[in-house]
């Protein structure tokens, strides 16, 4: 019974000893697009080290052996004097993985064995900060980077920390500037902003002022349009009146002026319009006696003769011609012994 107990005890001890002999894992971070050097943690090259071997996915990629040239699977790799492995090519995401390093002494014993977990990360970009005053909300965002953490500070106080590309925060005061920081194992970027927002009362007055200004502008525009329409209406009415005046003048000119009567024509018309006296009627002028019949006949013929026209008067040259004198006959009731003078 005692033997069984001792056997089980030694078995457990041996298992625990094997577990303690397991290889340690070390994480090494690389930058996307850049080379990397894999250093051996807690190791220093000494004269009793004979060999350093680097293996990736079961394949020997590089080997350092004392008194022999180093073995390199390609020119991409290089073993340094301290035993570190240098990868010269720009690292890509698919270059992430586990690299195993084994160190042997001159006696052939294993001095060290470690697994290095290589992870390739993208550097973070500079954060951006924007805010909205009506909502009192601030947003911090990062566009590029992998496996980073976003942190927001106000002054020296950490407000929030999240492993995501954007983060929002609703502030209660603006006593200190805000700082947004993005960080991952291979890079770190930050940005600081001072947020300025008008107070609510001021924004209310600004809104009221803008509204009143807009209303006043609308009224001024309406008044301007009204004045323009009124002026156009007045000009149109004035043009209509001018057209009416021009039309009346044109009709008057087309009718022509009435002919003015000359004194000679007026006298002729008056003579022509006078009705001849009835037969047997004799005109008597006060203070004169009636003329004899022969004289009346000659005088009546002279009265009927039309006066010369204005054209004939202007065409006649020289002094006017003398008219024959007519001697009046003595009245019938005069004495028989009175003799008439001889005619000229």
Curated annotation (Swiss-Prot):
Residues 319-331 have a biased composition (Pro residues). Disulfide bonds join 133-197, 140-180. The keyword tRNA processing does not apply. Residues 238-344 are annotated as: Disordered. Residues 264-274 have a biased composition (Low complexity). Residues 23-121 form the Ig-like V-type domain. GO terms for cellular component: cell-cell junction; cytoplasmic side of plasma membrane; external side of plasma membrane; extracellular region; Golgi apparatus; nucleoplasm; plasma membrane. Residues 100-114 are annotated as: CD58 binding region 2. Its main location: membrane. The keyword Repeat applies. Residues 230-344 are cytoplasmic. Keywords: Cell adhesion, Cell membrane, Disulfide bond, Glycoprotein, Immunoglobulin domain, Membrane, Repeat, Signal, Transmembrane, Transmembrane helix. Glycans are attached at residues 82, 94, 135, 166. Residues 1-22 form the signal peptide. Residues 56-68 are annotated as: CD58 binding region 1. Interacts with CD48. Interacts with CD58 (LFA-3). Interacts with CD2AP. Interacts with PSTPIP1. Interacts with FCGR3A; this interaction modulates NK cell activation and cytotoxicity. This is T-cell surface antigen CD2. It comes from Mus musculus (Mouse). The gene is Cd2.
